Amino acid sequence: MATVNEFRGAMSRGGGVQRQHRWRVTISFPSFAASADQTRDVCLLAVTTNTPTGQLGEILVPWGGRELPFPGDRRFEALPITFINVVNNGPYNSMEVWQQYINGSESNRASANPDEYFRDVVLELLDANDNVTKTWTLQGAWPQNLGQLELDMSAMDSYTQFTCDLRYFQAVSDRSR
């Protein structure tokens, strides 16, 4: 069994614990969805998310009466980001405009140029001095699911928030090969 000092040493060698609240997300909104000021505000109002997951598929090869699992293709799941909503609905509206541009509720039409709506999103982990310790870039991201704003007449001491699931082609990190 390790001693407390060995445990503390392992933590110290790694730079201390990674605080759960030390992160930032940078969404490069399309120009039609948000101005530079709106983009900055939306990024500041992001309150929860996860790191991107990477999953390898499985290829089952029958051999000798068994199935041998071999690694398959890499898959990426949508990344949920929860935002605080403000009175002017800026964060929600920016995501909604972006999503409507991809496929409008009324027009049922998409933009002619997908390069206009596929955008990179950068997620960074930070240390206590705001130095970046790890980076992921979600390449070709777009808002797949724009969550609801929960409204409640009996709510007190709370605010509205919503979650947007970003779908993307792939996530690359500072350790990707």
Curated annotation (Swiss-Prot):
<keyword id="KW-1228">Viral tail tube protein</keyword>
<keyword id="KW-1160">Virus entry into host cell</keyword>
<keyword id="KW-1227">Viral tail protein</keyword>
<keyword id="KW-1242">Viral contractile tail ejection system</keyword>
<comment type="function">
    <text>Structural component of the bacteriophage tail which consists of a contractile sheath, a tube and a baseplate. The central cylindrical segment of the tail consists of a rigid tube, composed of multiple copies of the tail tube protein. During infection, contraction of the sheath drives the central tube through the host outer membrane, creating a channel for DNA ejection from the capsid into the host cell.</text>
</comment>
<comment type="similarity">
    <text>Belongs to the T4-like viruses Gp19 protein family.</text>
</comment>
<keyword id="KW-0426">Late protein</keyword>
<keyword id="KW-1162">Viral penetration into host cytoplasm</keyword>
<keyword id="KW-0946">Virion</keyword>
<keyword id="KW-1171">Viral genome ejection through host cell envelope</keyword>
<dbReference type="GO" id="GO:0099000">
    <property type="term" value="P:symbiont genome ejection through host cell envelope, contractile tail mechanism"/>
</dbReference>
<dbReference type="GO" id="GO:0098026">
    <property type="term" value="C:virus tail, tube"/>
</dbReference>
<protein>
    <recommendedName>
        <fullName>Tail tube protein</fullName>
    </recommendedName>
</protein>
